[in-house]
UniProtKB/Swiss-Prot annotation:
<dbReference type="InterPro" id="IPR027363">
    <property type="entry name" value="M1Pi_N"/>
</dbReference>
<keyword id="KW-0028">Amino-acid biosynthesis</keyword>
<dbReference type="GO" id="GO:0005737">
    <property type="term" value="C:cytoplasm"/>
</dbReference>
<feature type="site" description="Transition state stabilizer">
    <location>
        <position position="177"/>
    </location>
</feature>
<dbReference type="GO" id="GO:0019509">
    <property type="term" value="P:L-methionine salvage from methylthioadenosine"/>
</dbReference>
<dbReference type="InterPro" id="IPR005251">
    <property type="entry name" value="IF-M1Pi"/>
</dbReference>
<keyword id="KW-0963">Cytoplasm</keyword>
<dbReference type="InterPro" id="IPR000649">
    <property type="entry name" value="IF-2B-related"/>
</dbReference>
<keyword id="KW-0413">Isomerase</keyword>
<dbReference type="InterPro" id="IPR037171">
    <property type="entry name" value="NagB/RpiA_transferase-like"/>
</dbReference>
<feature type="active site" description="Proton donor">
    <location>
        <position position="257"/>
    </location>
</feature>
<protein>
    <recommendedName>
        <fullName>Methylthioribose-1-phosphate isomerase</fullName>
        <ecNumber>5.3.1.23</ecNumber>
    </recommendedName>
</protein>
<dbReference type="GO" id="GO:0005634">
    <property type="term" value="C:nucleus"/>
</dbReference>
<comment type="function">
    <text>Catalyzes the interconversion of methylthioribose-1-phosphate (MTR-1-P) into methylthioribulose-1-phosphate (MTRu-1-P).</text>
</comment>
<dbReference type="Pfam" id="PF01008">
    <property type="entry name" value="IF-2B"/>
</dbReference>
<keyword id="KW-0486">Methionine biosynthesis</keyword>
<dbReference type="InterPro" id="IPR042529">
    <property type="entry name" value="IF_2B-like_C"/>
</dbReference>
């Protein structure tokens, strides 16, 4: 039986009632800087500027950020009645949802919170209504930690069972981006599965793609692995296919920013490349994400808005801030942050806190609604 995770991990979200501090992940691993979140504008900027990133962490930070900002305004008299608090909460949720478009966790979380805010009693005192929202936001955080733990256990058990069926007692995993403690409330999704394998002594090695242009794999995933002495090999993004050809990779495990009704998955740019290569090389690819990442309202990846960011993220050195690409009147830069992996390329399964759904033999390969409906 898999042991329950209990190890200490990095914290990117430091929350106590009335206080929220977020780790500026753009500065890792060279600097460890926490920013105070005092206003709704603060949390919007933190998400937009990618100081906080990772779909689950974005949602949790948004909920807690709005809670702290509301509590402060109620305490200093800017919000004088329960109705004013209720109105502020609803408009704040709408505003924060404009920060980034692709990760569905943010929208699922804030839409759910808005529905619960509508049910609050506006005739109560401002502080009382604000406190009611604080408790709702804290539940978002607590639930995400529990989701992490479920994903870890289910994913590790499933992958290890498949390896044992082939006579292997330990496994090597390939992943992309950062899907660990820095991207969630505690342990992670895809990297959480890696963590559980490591905690149970069943991880041979994790291979981390550098993940251009923000280098989340090189800067963040490697940073997490080094902190816990998890055996890790960093590779250039373009080396993944050669890795699958020349070394034994038991599975590719990736995270998700949105999983559509049919299983099509939006994730960090480069995930689609890995999926195509994994299919060719006969390596199972798994998507690990909480049910808050499932989007039953979007039929397929064709309907997902893909965020595109500034060209400078590609042309400028992240550390020195110097341009390292030649310029000219006919040069253009295309910088999509995410891509869509079609469900037929998710050959291993979708891992959630509820278990692992393996693909069907033919299309539709996944039924996301049935995962949500599970007890």
């Amino acid at each position: 039986m898999m042991s329950k995770p209990h190890h200490a991990t990095l914290e990117s979200i430091k929350y106590t009632p009335g206080s929220l501090r977020l780790l500026d992940q753009r500065k890792l691993p060279l600097e460890t800087v926490f920013d105070d979140v005092l206003t709704v504008e603060d949390i919007w900027s933190a998400i937009k500027e990618m100081r906080v990133r990772g779909a689950p962490a974005i949602a949790v930070s948004a909920a807690l950020g709005i809670a702290v900002a509301t509590q402060r305004k109620a305490a200093n008299g800017e919000l004088k009645s329960g109705r004013e608090v209720q109105t502020f909460l609803l408009t704040s949720c709408d505003f924060v949802m404009t920060s980034r478009p692709t990760a569905v966790n943010l929208f699922n979380c804030l839409r759910d919170l808005k529905a619960q805010v509508d049910k609050l009693d506006p005739t109560k005192a401002a502080a009382e209504v604000a406190q009611a929202f604080v408790e709702l936001a804290e539940a978002v955080y607590t639930n995400d930690v529990a989701f992490n733990e479920g994903i870890m256990r289910h994913g590790a058990a499933h992958i290890l069972a498949a390896a044992k069926a082939e006579g292997r007692d330990k496994v090597s995993i390939l992943t992309i981006c950062n899907t660990g403690a820095l991207a969630t409330s505690r342990y992670g999704t895809a990297l959480g599965v890696v963590r559980q394998l490591f905690y149970d002594g069943k991880l041979e090695r994790v291979y981390a793609c550098e993940t251009r242009p923000w280098n989340q794999g090189a800067r963040l995933t490697v940073y997490e692995c080094v902190q816990e002495d998890i055996p890790c090999t960093l590779i250039c993004d373009g080396a993944a296919s050669s890795l699958m050809l020349n070394r034994k990779i038991d599975a590719v495990v990736v995270g998700a920013d949105r999983i559509c009704q049919n299983g099509d998955t939006a994730n960090k740019i480069g995930t689609y490349n890995l999926a195509v290569s994994a299919k060719f090389h006969g390596v199972k690819l798994y998507v690990a994400a909480p049910t808050t990442t499932l989007d039953v309202k979007t039929a397929s990846g064709n309907h997902v808005e893909i965020e595109e960011r500034e060209p400078t993220e590609i042309t400028t050195n992240l550390v020195t801030k110097q341009r390292v690409v030649a310029d000219g009147p006919h040069l253009s830069i295309w910088n999509p942050v995410f891509d869509i992996t079609p469900s037929e390329l998710i050959t291993g399964g979708i891992i959630t806190e509820k278990g692992v759904q393996a693909p069907a033999a033919s299309a539709p390969y996944y039924d996301i609604a049935s995962i949500i409906a599970q007890a």
